[in-house]
A protein has these predicted regions:
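Basic/aromatic-rich interaction segments and small domains that mediate binding to polyanionic partners
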Residues: 2-65, 70
Length: 74
């Protein structure tokens, strides 16, 4: 199970207009022992772009061999 404040990768495309598969967020709350997560996604200025509840299957931990990437949101 992932822990609060862990960085996670969105592992599917989202219905949220500004999120895409591969975006990185932070777990801010854990539901039902890890069955779901509240995840915050922020922009480069630290402003919240989305705060959404996701199933455990929708996110995964960042792998040690993965490189972070930047993209425009609008």
């Amino acid at each position: 199970m992932m822990k609060e404040h862990s960085l996670v990768v969105l592992d599917r495309d989202s219905t949220h207009e500004k999120l895409s598969r591969g975006d990185i967020g932070t777990i801010v709350h854990i539901y039902d022992g890890g069955k779901g997560y509240e995840v915050e996604f922020v922009d480069g200025s630290g402003h919240t772009v989305a705060l959404i509840t996701l199933d455990a299957a929708d996110v995964r931990p960042i792998g040690p061999d993965e490189l972070l990437h930047v993209r425009r949101t609008a």
